[in-house]
Amino acid sequence: MLKTIKIFSDGSCLGNPGPGGYSFIIQHLEYENISSSGFYLTTNNRMELMGIIVATESLKQPCCITISTDSQYVQKGILYWIKNWKTKGWKTSRKTYVKNVDLWLRLEKSLNLHQVTWKWIKSHSGNKKNEQCDHLARESAKFPTLKDFGYIL
């Protein structure tokens, strides 16, 4: 039987592009893992993706995961858009190149091991775990320690 895991995640960027951070909370039964990191120069969307990627990459065995995010970009991207992007050589419907391909590929790979359900949460709607992730992501953006090597101006 698969472990049932809840993941809450959020990303933040001060300036967009600018310093950014992500945070996630992983819950399993009474266990809770909270993590966050800050980057010197990145974007909000990259941080939204990174939070979920780092959380799911930390799971070493197949799990049944519910991922809660306030990012429609991430949720719609992985559920609806990615198949067309890949078919069209990573181009959008407007024939421009998809941004953050490096992270979309990492996200897709990190999810392959798991059974995943996506739950969209409206930003700042009072969901305590989402609010906690939002706060930690913003704080991490204020004190960056990492370089986002995949970010290209």
UniProtKB/Swiss-Prot annotation:
Its cofactor is Mg(2+). The keyword Membrane does not apply. Binds 1 Mg(2+) ion per subunit. May bind a second metal ion at a regulatory site, or after substrate binding. Its main location: cytoplasm. It catalyses: Endonucleolytic cleavage to 5'-phosphomonoester. InterPro entries: RNase_H, RNaseH-like_sf, RNaseH_domain, RNaseH_sf, RNaseHI. Pfam families: RNase_H. Residues 1-142 form the RNase H type-1 domain. GO terms for molecular function: magnesium ion binding; nucleic acid binding; RNA-DNA hybrid ribonuclease activity. One of its GO terms (biological process) is DNA replication, removal of RNA primer. One of its GO terms (cellular component) is cytoplasm. It comes from the Bacteria. Its EC number is 3.1.26.4. Keywords: Cytoplasm, Endonuclease, Hydrolase, Magnesium, Metal-binding, Nuclease. It is found in: Cytoplasm. Mg(2+) 2 binds at D10, D134. Monomer. HAMAP family: RNase_H. Endonuclease that specifically degrades the RNA of RNA-DNA hybrids. Belongs to the RNase H family. This is Ribonuclease H. It comes from Buchnera aphidicola subsp. Baizongia pistaciae (strain Bp). The gene is rnhA.
